[in-house]
């Protein structure tokens, strides 16, 4: 939906704010949820921040809104989808932002880019089970 590279760039800029950051490569994966739509472009952003999970969720929603995201169809097409996966060693049981993300270990589009930035968090066996589902596209700069 729209310029995926531009949406990812906008999302990164808004979510990271002024915090130092690292970013994974961008990967293309099949859509999740069973609704017919284009393949997804995915990345993982790591930021050094004192923001709480709720603060990060607010940044995520701001980024999605800036890219014109609407929530008309559950798991339907969207311009940008930002999930808060981990916040240091913090946990959150707030139903709006569960941390660690409860399904991240089931998602190739999370684990492959996460492994680039934090290899100690992802086991090799788990990675191997997902590799054929993910196509590396390159860095975000290459896709703009």
Question: Language-model features: where?
Answer:
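N-terminal beta1-alpha1 ligand-phosphate binding loop
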Residues: 1-18, 23-28
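Flexible, gly/pro- and Lys/Arg-enriched active-site loops
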Residues: 24, 31-39, 54-144
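Active-site-adjacent structural patch at catalytic or cofactor/ligand-binding sites
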Residues: 42
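Helix N-cap motif at beta-to-alpha junctions
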Residues: 49-52
């Amino acid at each position: 939906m729209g310029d995926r590279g531009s949406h990812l760039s906008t999302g990164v800029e808004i979510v990271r704010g002024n915090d130092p950051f690292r970013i994974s490569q961008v990967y293309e994966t099949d859509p999740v949820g069973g609704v017919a739509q284009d393949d997804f472009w995915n990345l993982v952003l790591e930021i050094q921040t004192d923001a709480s999970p709720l603060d990060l969720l607010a940044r995520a929603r701001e980024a999605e809104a800036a890219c014109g995201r609407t929530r008309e169809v559950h798991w339907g097409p969207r311009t940008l989808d930002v999930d808060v996966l981990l916040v240091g060693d913090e946990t959150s049981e707030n139903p709006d932002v569960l941390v660690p993300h409860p399904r991240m270990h089931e998602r190739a589009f999370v684990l492959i880019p996460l492994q680039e930035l934090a290899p100690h968090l992802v086991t090799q066996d788990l990675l191997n089970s997902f590799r054929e589902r993910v196509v590396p596209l390159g860095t975000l700069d290459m896709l703009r």
